[in-house]
């Protein structure tokens, strides 16, 4: 069993809930695909730094989500917010071995580790969606931890100034094989399919 989330994490969730659920009109589907217990990897598309909130709110407070955050975000005072929110740092571009090891240990310990295979935000009008080559970290972590790989899609976080609506869809587990690249290809295809339903 994973340790209980810190009070700061719970406080962030409680304070965020009215904003995300009602002001931004968050709606979700596919929650039945998300394991209620045990660790797993949750992989989604990435369009905004706000993505963790709508992705995690439907699972709050019964699941404590842990996020990989790029190391350059870890400056004071933001690092305290990231730590309280369950994040841990990763060096982008070099395949951070320590971050992967930490993620595997967290999943084995019963945590939910959130991954964005695109590796960076895809903003409409700035960069064509789905064009970048995805990273295989989510598939590798799920394989090494022997845990489910759950796809998810997020829509609306690139239009926050309009106050929603925000949509999230969770899909059934992706079969994880020894070929992380092939697993990632199927993962991204499912994320894209889910996104088209939003």
Please provide the spans of the model-predicted regions.
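Non-catalytic C-terminal accessory region of glycerolipid acyltransferases
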Residues: 1-7, 98-198
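A transmembrane-helix-recognition feature enriched in membrane-embedded lipid enzymes
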Residues: 2-36, 54, 76-85
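Short, basic, glycine/proline-bearing loop/turn elements
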Residues: 16, 84-91, 120-125
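A generic structural signal for well-ordered alpha-helical segments
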Residues: 19-21, 60, 81-82, 106, ...
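A conditional alpha-helix N-cap/helix-loop micro-motif detector
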Residues: 24, 93-97, 131
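A secondary-structure boundary/capping signal
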Residues: 30, 69-70, 86, 116-118, ...
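Residues at the C-termini of beta-strands that transition into short coil/loop
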Residues: 32, 71, 91, 153, ...
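Catalytic core of membrane glycerolipid acyltransferases/transacylases, capturing the structured
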Residues: 34-94
């Amino acid at each position: 069993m994973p340790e209980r989330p810190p009070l700061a994490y719970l406080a962030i969730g409680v304070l965020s809930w009215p904003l995300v659920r009602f002001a931004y009109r968050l709606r979700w589907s596919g929650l039945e695909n998300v394991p209620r217990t045990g660790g797993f990897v949750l992989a989604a598309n990435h369009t905004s730094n706000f993505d963790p909130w709508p992705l995690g709110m439907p699972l709050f407070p019964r699941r404590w989500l842990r996020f990989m955050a790029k190391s350059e975000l870890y400056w004071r005072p933001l690092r305290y917010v990231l730590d309280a929110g369950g994040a841990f740092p990763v060096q982008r571009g070099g395949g951070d071995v320590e971050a992967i090891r930490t993620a595997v240990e967290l999943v084995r310990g019963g945590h939910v580790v959130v991954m964005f295979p695109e590796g960076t935000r895809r903003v409409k009008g700035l960069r064509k969606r789905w064009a970048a080559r995805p990273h295989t970290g989510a598939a590798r972590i799920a394989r090494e931890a022997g845990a489910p790989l759950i796809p998810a899609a997020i829509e609306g976080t690139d239009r926050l100034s309009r106050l929603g609506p925000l949509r999230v869809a969770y899909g059934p587990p992706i079969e994880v094989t020894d070929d992380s690249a092939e697993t990632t290809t199927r993962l991204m295809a499912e994320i894209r399919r889910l996104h088209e339903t939003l």
